[in-house]
Amino acid sequence: MIDFRPFYQQIATTNLSDWLETLPLQLKEWETQTHGDYAKWSKIVDFLSDLHADEIDLKSAVKSDRTSPLSEGEKQRIIHHLKQLMPWRKGPYHLFGIHVDCEWRSDFKWDRVLPHLSPLQGRTILDVGCGSGYHMWRMVGEGAKMVVGIDPTELFLCQFEAVRKLLNNDRRANLIPLGIEQMQPLAAFDTVFSMGVLYHRKSPLDHLSQLKNQLVKGGELVLETLVVDGDVNTVLIPADRYAKMKNVYFIPSVAALINWLEKVGFTNVRCVDVATTTLEEQRKTDWLENESLIDFLDPNDHSKTIEGYQAPKRAVILANK
């Protein structure tokens, strides 16, 4: 089972220390309600060899390697363990010569977001809905002091811990298996990321307020989410599914999204990037047995989802508390 005590020790003397009033009890309760496969997944993490990497690159990729290559047997054992943690959705990872080719080329998103950010050097960062943590490692690569990701999905936690083990057990990033609605308002993070989360929320303004509550005064929000074309009054509310996803509730235009952010009290709100999701960025691989973007689009018109809505387009919005 994953041991969170090192994280408690890490934050005990930081601005996050108030979290210790609630977090240990929440995680004890979480352990009693975990997914039926969690014990199996966490054992897979334990089975991974403690390999020492001579080279780690988190600046241009998430990559570890050593001067003497793994034997083919060692490499196949690691691949076997990592494939037991499928599906791998966000990546890619390059670990001791093994290319974990995930469904999403999350490096594409990072390349769109990074040029617009306030420097991450020395910052304490919260990544909401962090998945298996790919972007967290890239934040560490930009010099972040501490990155905390929150995501309630147990598989993502085990994937994150598996990658951590193959990155010399780097403790600068930590994944906590909770949702933001379970976090007390800490007002302690210099930067808060919420990427690919807002459209899954039944109450998007509540989500934006929760993000604001975690930021220090003047801190930076990085919001990345689905948008549709239209004016300040345009919001798509899918009748049933959107791109085969059941849990999509509100997809605003950029103008409407900026209005929402200003309404909950953010300042200096600006859109810095808009990009249509491509079949190069989201696709099937050997590390994902499920459907992917090609299956979610109208086969005769890729500008539409299979339900007839505008195809996925994503905006990056920055704002300050």
Curated annotation (Swiss-Prot):
Cross-referenced InterPro entries: CmoB (IPR010017), Mo5U34_MeTrfas-like (IPR027555), SAM-dependent_MTases_sf (IPR029063)
Residues annotated to bind carboxy-S-adenosyl-L-methionine: 90, 104, 109, 129, 151-153, 180-181, 195, 199, 314
Pfam family, one: Methyltransf_9
Enzyme class: transferase
Catalytic activity: carboxy-S-adenosyl-L-methionine + 5-hydroxyuridine(34) in tRNA = 5-carboxymethoxyuridine(34) in tRNA + S-adenosyl-L-homocysteine + H(+)
EC number: 2.5.1.-
GO molecular function: methyltransferase activity; transferase activity, transferring alkyl or aryl (other than methyl) groups
Keywords, comma-separated and alphabetical: Transferase, tRNA processing
SUPFAM superfamilies: S-adenosyl-L-methionine-dependent methyltransferases
Biological processes, Gene Ontology terms: tRNA wobble uridine modification
Similarity annotation: Belongs to the class I-like SAM-binding methyltransferase superfamily. CmoB family.
Function recorded in the entry: Catalyzes carboxymethyl transfer from carboxy-S-adenosyl-L-methionine (Cx-SAM) to 5-hydroxyuridine (ho5U) to form 5-carboxymethoxyuridine (cmo5U) at position 34 in tRNAs.
HAMAP family from the UniProt entry: tRNA_carboxymethyltr_CmoB
Record's subunit section: Homotetramer.
Protein name, per record: tRNA U34 carboxymethyltransferase
Gene, per the UniProt record: cmoB
